[in-house]
Structure formats: C-alpha cells, structure tokens
C-alpha cells in the first residue's frame, strides 16, 4: 500500500482526496494536512452571502473532515506544514501545537493561492500567514470563510456605522463585492489601477457594458487610479489614490492572488509567476511530487503553452488528474481555456480563451468577428433579450482563439461551453459557421448570433 500525503484541502485538494478515496482507497493510505479550520468553502458564493442574496453560508460547503475521514483518510486541520525534506520524503507539520513528522511515498501540493497585498501605506502583512493585520481597523480582504464572516459581523454591528466602502480591485471578486455592498445600501466606490473593470477577461467594448451597469446601480468607479495610502485615527477614514481622496469607513482589498508555493524551498522548479511548474500529469520537477489547483500551472489550449489560470473549475480537474497519477494510474489533462462568467444585477457575461488584446500579445495574427441580435425571433415578446457576441480567431490558421458574450438572458452561459470545446479541438471559424445548431423560436433564431458572427467573419 502506497502512502500519499496531501498538503491542502481546498477545492483542488478535496477533489484530489475524494478521487483517490473513491477509486483507489484500498490501494493507498491518504494523509492530509491543512492550515485552515474548514474544508471546501465555495469562495465564489462569498459575495452572495455578504450581499444577503442567500440565506447563509451553510450551503457554501460541500465536504468536511468527517466526510473525508469516513472514507478512510487521516485529516489534520489547523495544522500548517512547516517544512518538507524531499530527499528523505518527510513532511513536518504543526499539529495541536507540537511538531509532527509524516513520511510519504507520494506528495501532492494543493496549497492554493494567497491574496496579493499591494504596497499601500497603512497596511502591514504578516509574513508566512494567509491572514494579515492592518495598522488600521476595517481594512479587509476576502479569501477564506472567516474573512467573509468577519466582514459580515462588522457590517451587522450598527454601532460601527460602516456606510461607505471602498473596494480595491476591479476583477471578478471586486465587482461582485461592489454589488453585494450596494445591495446592503452602502455607498460604494470601486478602485482599480487599470482604466476598466474585468480587465483580462473581456475586451474593452465589453467591459464598458459592465462599467455602465455598475454606474447605473450607483456604484462609483475610480478607474485608472493607484491606491497610495489608507488613513485614519485607529480606524479607516479615507483612501488616497494618485488622483483623489475618498472618505470611507471600510476598505476591501481584492487585487488578485498569487500561488502559494513557499514550501518549494528552492527544490522544485517554478513558473515565472511562482507557481509550481507541472506537466500534463500534474507532476512537478521532483518525481512523485504533484501540484494541483491554484498553486500550479496549467496547459492553455488557446496559447498552446503553459500558463497560470486560477479558477475553481481548473482546480477540480487538475485535482482529479493529480489523484490518478499519484495513485499510479496514468492520466493526462487535456488543457484548459479559462472559461469563466459573471452575473451582476442581471447582466450576464461569459468568456473563454483569449481576448483580442491577449491574442495579439501572444503572437497571433488575430482578428475578431461579432454580432448583436435578439436571443429569439422578434415575434417572441417575452423574455427576449439582446445578445452581443465576439469571436476572436487567428487569420492565418482560422482557428478560434476566444469568445465573449453578454446579455440579460442567462441562456448564453451554456453557449460558451461550445466555444471552450472549439478552442480545445482547434475548430476554425469557417467550420463553426456551418455547425449544426438547432432552431426553435422558444430558444433562438434560425440565423442565430453564433452562426451570424461566424458567417460574417473576415475571409
């Protein structure tokens, strides 16, 4: 029986552990260390919880220590791994305040990512910990369950009068949190160093639609501004950028995440951003040591190269692949496209692959084709929304490189999966134009927006 130690029980770790226990549990001894107090928190639902769009946090968990141990794993919670002896294959962790050593035959990292803290006067990070302390009260970041719980508890305390909130970071998490706070009746300003929201996921003509959507719901946008300082007498009172000052009562830092790979200790090859560099079997540069989820690289089918794309969906898939290979059952990942989506005040946006800007930066002779239309025929008077689509493709090979869609009709969310598969399988824009897409007035038009965008593509 092989002994496998898993460091981290986040989404990737949980997927990995469950896959091993469900399929190869009789063949392996599984030992898990995690520095957190809970398992499987769905951070993507955090804004819904904070904004009171769901009843509570209970449904945001799908596993726990007891469930994993019932299947046969040994799980140590609140037990950070301190060091790893790769030569002798020994993990040293802190368990109940004491040093604990665990030998292994195979090792899997599922250490996830840690929030990026930009250089801001007034904020101090505690090195080596996923938490941070600030020199001012009410400077928050949101990554873990307890982070969100702390924000909710503070907002629930009416004596604190936390009515004005600044969210720093205009990515998915920042935009979702801005909506959540506005839904609570707070005065919200969203600050980002770039001049648009959702930068990197969509081209600017699409991001402008989301920016207008936010402003239409009374969220102030302070884009193209760099945060310089957070000031106050014991508590947050104002946020200072390179262009203006905002009187606020709370600051949320949501500027992104970096891979948590401190345990590499100079022994494992890392990607340019510090992630564990892995092959298609999720194996690192040390044989028998694997990495899955946000701490590891992925193969990007749009770029045809190794990349870093931190998404829960990627975490689950890489966890499955890593589990099979660690257990001696060969399985290669098929790569990713970075498919993603967001829904803010009923405006739904989805994308996959590369934006036009990213495609050009990656060296492609890229161009785009697009189309705007109703989802259904004009005679369908109810629940018939406008849809905008953009398809990015390479002029030379004609291969589809990316797609973006936006609408108040949530049905577009399923369409992006087709484009994800198209990128994975190197489908051309010309083949897409003749792809068999069904028609029924309840769903779409005979010449629907996907077909029309492909048919009108530059030859």
Curated annotation (Swiss-Prot):
Which positions does UniProt annotate for FAD binding? 44, 110-113, 294, 312
The free-text cofactor remark is: Binds 1 FAD per subunit.
Quote the catalytic residue positions.
11, 44
- Tagged with keyword Flavoprotein: yes
- Gene3D superfamilies the UniProt entry points to: 3.30.390.30, FAD/NAD(P)-binding domain
- The residues that hold NAD(+) are 173, 192, 201, 256, 310, 341
Cell location: Secreted, Cell wall
Pfam families for the chain = Pyr_redox_2, Pyr_redox_dim
Q: What is its EC number?
A: 1.6.3.4
Keywords, A to Z, come to: Cell wall, FAD, Flavoprotein, NAD, Oxidation, Oxidoreductase, Redox-active center, Secreted, Translocase
- Output one GO MF annotation: oxidoreductase activity
- Any one Gene Ontology cellular component term annotated for this protein: extracellular region
The signal peptide, as residue positions, is: none
**InterPro entries, per database record:** FAD-bd_OxRdtase (IPR050260), FAD/NAD-bd_sf (IPR036188), FAD/NAD-binding_dom (IPR023753), FAD/NAD-linked_Rdtase_dimer_sf (IPR016156), Pyr_nucl-diS_OxRdtase_dimer (IPR004099)
Q: Which residues carry this modification: Cysteine sulfinic acid (-SO2H)?
A: 44
Q: What class of enzyme is it?
A: oxidoreductase
Look up what happens after changing residue 44 to S.
Answer: In Cp8054; abolishes NADH oxidase activity. Normal growth under aerobic conditions
Effect of disrupting the coding gene: NADH oxidase activity was almost undetectable, regardless of the growth conditions. No significant difference in H(2)O(2) production. Dramatically inhibited growth under conditions of vigorous aeration in vitro, but no significant difference in growth under limited aeration conditions. Significantly reduces number of mutant strain 0100993 bacteria recovered from the lungs in a CBA/J mouse intranasal infection model. Significantly reduces number of mutant strain 0100993 bacteria recovered from the middle ear in a Mongolian gerbil otitis media infection model.
Cofactor(s) this protein requires: FAD
Which purpose does this protein serve, as stated in its record?
Catalyzes the four-electron reduction of molecular oxygen to water. Plays a role in redox balance maintenance. May be involved in mediating bacterial adhesion to host cells. May be considered a potential virulence factor.
Q: Which family does it belong to?
A: Belongs to the class-III pyridine nucleotide-disulfide oxidoreductase family.
Task: Enumerate the NCBIfam families for this protein.
Answer: NOXase_Strep
| Name of protein | NADH oxidase
By which gene is this protein encoded?
Answer: nox
């Amino acid at each position: 029986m092989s002994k496998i130690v898993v460091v981290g029980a986040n989404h990737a770790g949980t997927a990995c552990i469950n896959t091993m226990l469900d399929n190869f549990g009789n063949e392996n001894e599984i030992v898990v260390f995690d520095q957190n107090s809970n398992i499987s928190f769905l951070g993507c639902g955090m804004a819904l919880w904070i904004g009171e769009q769901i009843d509570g946090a209970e449904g945001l968990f799908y596993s726990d220590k007891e469930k994993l141990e019932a299947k046969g794993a040994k799980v140590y919670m609140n037990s950070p791994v301190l060091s790893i002896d790769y030569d002798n294959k020994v993990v040293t962790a802190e368990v109940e305040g004491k040093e604990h050593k665990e030998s292994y035959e195979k090792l899997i990292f599922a250490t996830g990512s840690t929030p990026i803290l930009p250089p801001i006067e007034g904020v101090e990070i505690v090195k080596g910990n996923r938490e941070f302390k600030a020199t001012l009260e009410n400077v928050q970041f949101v990554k873990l369950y307890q982070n969100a719980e702390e924000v909710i508890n503070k907002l629930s305390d009416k004596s604190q009068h936390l009515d004005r909130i600044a969210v720093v970071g205009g990515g998915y998490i920042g935009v979702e949190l801005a909506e959540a706070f506005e839904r609570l009746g707070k005065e919200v300003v969203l600050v980002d160093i770039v001049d648009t929201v959702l930068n990197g996921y969509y081209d600017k003509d699409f991001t402008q639609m989301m920016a207008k959507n936010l402003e239409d719901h009374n969220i102030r946008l302070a884009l193209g501004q760099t945060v310089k300082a957070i000031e106050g007498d014991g508590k947050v009172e104002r946020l200072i950028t390179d262009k203006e000052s905002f009187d606020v009562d709370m600051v949320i830092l949501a500027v992104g995440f970096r891979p948590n790979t401190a345990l590499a200790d100079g022994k494992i090859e890392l990607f340019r951003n510090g992630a564990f560099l892995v092959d298609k079997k999720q194996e690192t540069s040390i044989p028998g040591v694997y990495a899955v989820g946000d701490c590891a690289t992925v193969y990007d089918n749009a770029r045809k190269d190794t990349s870093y794309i931190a998404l829960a969906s990627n975490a689950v898939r890489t966890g499955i692949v890593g589990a099979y290979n660690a257990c001696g059952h060969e399985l290669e990942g098929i790569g990713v496209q970075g498919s993603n989506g967001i829904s803010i005040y009923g405006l739904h946006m989805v994308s996959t692959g590369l934006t036009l800007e990213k495609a050009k930066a990656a060296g492609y002779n890229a161009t785009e084709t697009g189309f705007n239309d109703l989802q259904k025929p004009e005679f369908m008077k109810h629940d018939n929304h406008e849809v905008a689509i953009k398809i990015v493709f390479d002029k030379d090979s004609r291969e589809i490189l990316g797609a973006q869609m936006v609408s108040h009709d949530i049905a577009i969310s399923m369409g992006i999966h087709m484009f994800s598969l198209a990128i994975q399988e190197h489908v051309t824009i010309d083949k897409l134009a003749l792809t068999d897409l069904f028609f029924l007035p309840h769903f779409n038009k005979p010449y629907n927006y996907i077909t029309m965008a492909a048919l009108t593509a530059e030859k």
